């Protein structure tokens, strides 16, 4: 059984075709600069060089159609025909309070996703365009929506509500939603598998650290708290996002600099975080600059690691203990520097890092010492596989 996973951004489309019997990737790639000049399609087939094709893609429908044409191209030998695709799984950023799990898409579901647009004005519209395009191009293939926010819908009210007038929540849905849910869920499940213990007996803190970063407290298989909030701007200092700041800074800086609300929003989302501190948004550059003696890069790295450690400490308290701490995503999987810096704050928990084991990159491993009371782990995330699994489960069991 083959599942096509799609992740539609405002001007991009990432795709992956998976063979679910072996859980292997048959093809993956992306279409970039949709609707802009210089758009191109990239096809990445196992064991072959990447194929790049520059051509105009005016919208998502044209882009998806081009991807489907490539998947059935005879010379690649991926699919004989499009009927071989059992189902399509769509990554949808925001499901609000409407969705606490993945769903088979129909008109009613699509309408509910459209109602969440005001919560994710940049992300949900292209997700919807991708679904509509697939309905047109593959009308008989079932489609499933997998929501970034769904995993965190198990948070209790004390964790998801803010200390603002209650009617803001009732009228506008202002609350903590959390993001990266598919990733947090995948690595929590994987951790229980590696540890050989049932998920419902574990307290796990998952650290999804990349250009966008979030930490989650997963108790007995359920998310009970997470660092991102109403939007993905809350929580940790990130590549270009500020993370937590005093809300009064917003009005203060608007007055001082004569900025509009939209301008401040743009600065906090795109010009802040480690970029604002150091001038670099890529953690690889920051590590390089820091080791070369760049003071601002060093500061940005210290701030980031300090904040990750603070969240881990807070979530250990929220769960009244922790069995495992998992590092995942681009920085979490590949930066031994970040992991070492974070873990030096965690000895009070009985979490001890094995510096030799910590040298690994992008591989599954337990990197704590044998006598560490808390297991420290690296688990590469695989959101596409998680989306494909949930898609297939729904389609097969419907």
Swiss-Prot record:
Which cofactors does it use? Mg(2+); Mn(2+)
**Reactions catalysed, as given in the entry:** acetate + ATP = acetyl phosphate + ADP
What Gene Ontology cellular component terms go with this record? cytoplasm
Protein name per the record? Acetate kinase
A biological process (GO) of this protein is: acetyl-CoA biosynthetic process
What gene, per UniProt, encodes this protein? ackA
Which locations, inside or outside the cell, does it occupy? Cytoplasm
State the superkingdom. Bacteria
Source organism: Carboxydothermus hydrogenoformans (strain ATCC BAA-161 / DSM 6008 / Z-2901)
